[in-house]
Amino acid sequence: MTITKQTGQVTAVADGTVVTPEGFQAAGVNAGLRYSKNDLGVILCDVPASAAAVYTQSHFQAAPLKVTQASLAVEQKLQAVIVNRPCANACTGAQGLKDAYEMRELCAKQFGLALHHVAVASTGVIGEYLPMEKIRAGIKQLVPGVTMADAEAFQTAILTTDTVMKRACYQTTIDGKTVTVGGAAKGSGMIHPNMATMLAFITTDANVSSPVLHAALRSITDVSFNQITVDGDTSTNDMVVVMASGLAGNDELTPDHPDWENFYEALRKTCEDLAKQIAKDGEGATKLIEVRVRGAKTDEEAKKIAKQIVGSNLVKTAVYGADANWGRIIGAIGYSDAEVNPDNVDVAIGPMVMLKGSEPQPFSEEEAAAYLQQETVVIEVDLHIGDGVGVAWGCDLTYDYVKINASYRT
């Protein structure tokens, strides 16, 4: 199934979380896995929910992803997702897989669920075994609730080098009923996904089947999470999970439903919002960079070039230094394998046109430097070849990125 519709009427819910949709609860506790803050969390649904997930394309998929895939393979439904930090349980062999299955079993037993209704996720250092004694005790401490405090307890439990919690929530109307989509995510470094993203957990009370939900998630992932980059590194643990309780009471959604576009847009906005928050919170970052490309041969080529630009270390450092060195943007376009006419390209940084028809344009260095001091920097490119459009998000590259990653384990 291919889904491409991307328009609809939605409203942002400023204080919305993963527990705002009907039927969801969350919790987070400090199980003493390493840090003094929460390090074990759960999202629980009142009913078995339609579910879908997308995963990292890394050859070294972590054990929790394999367990989640096994759970979803049974009937494509989930009722809980259990998450830990700061151990990724990746590259841990047979013992790591056994531990991930035990996490699933412990969660199912704690909340009275079927084993295959539990997803497992982990984030943190690769190559370390889970401290299972602490996890066994920690899961028993989880008491899910529906308050903002409960949602934030979960959100805290999934963070590693993140400096802020990432949450988003949007509402729309379907069959005259309010339908809500909420989400929580983590990610700051090792961000260059190719399928999903770091970790993201999406909840909704929409009535939608798992196959339709999966098709929508894959389509939306390609224009949201897959279009962000912080450092060009892809994690072993990247995963996006979405659960739909169906408790909003709408008629079952399909792409032919008259209100389908409303649901699709609410889901897309939630994912895009979380993706941009992840990009903005890149390790050591001070600015969000948004690159908009139009006039490409296809949307795919536009997305590819946008991500190429936002992922260029030379572009990222120029933005950090507030240096309007548009030649670095051209450099990134030039080594893309997308179709480019080098004699007719436009480049703008914010409101200032730097290049038009591949000819340099006069601009004020002072105004450009002032613009580049802003928290959000927009770069626009027009290739004048076709109708393809694409957007990508990233962040500047600072001295602090090196400091954070040089001492990550110590």
Curated annotation (Swiss-Prot):
It catalyses: N(2)-acetyl-L-ornithine + L-glutamate = N-acetyl-L-glutamate + L-ornithine; L-glutamate + acetyl-CoA = N-acetyl-L-glutamate + CoA + H(+). GO terms for molecular function: glutamate N-acetyltransferase activity; L-glutamate N-acetyltransferase activity. Heterotetramer of two alpha and two beta chains. Competitively inhibited by L-ornithine. Optimum temperature is 75 degrees Celsius (OATase activity). Pathway: Amino-acid biosynthesis; L-arginine biosynthesis; L-ornithine and N-acetyl-L-glutamate from L-glutamate and N(2)-acetyl-L-ornithine (cyclic): step 1/1; Amino-acid biosynthesis; L-arginine biosynthesis; N(2)-acetyl-L-ornithine from L-glutamate: step 1/4. Optimum pH is 8 for OATase activity and 8-8.5 for AGSase activity. This is Arginine biosynthesis bifunctional protein ArgJ. PANTHER family: ARGININE BIOSYNTHESIS BIFUNCTIONAL PROTEIN ARGJ (PTHR23100), ARGININE BIOSYNTHESIS BIFUNCTIONAL PROTEIN ARGJ, MITOCHONDRIAL (PTHR23100:SF0).
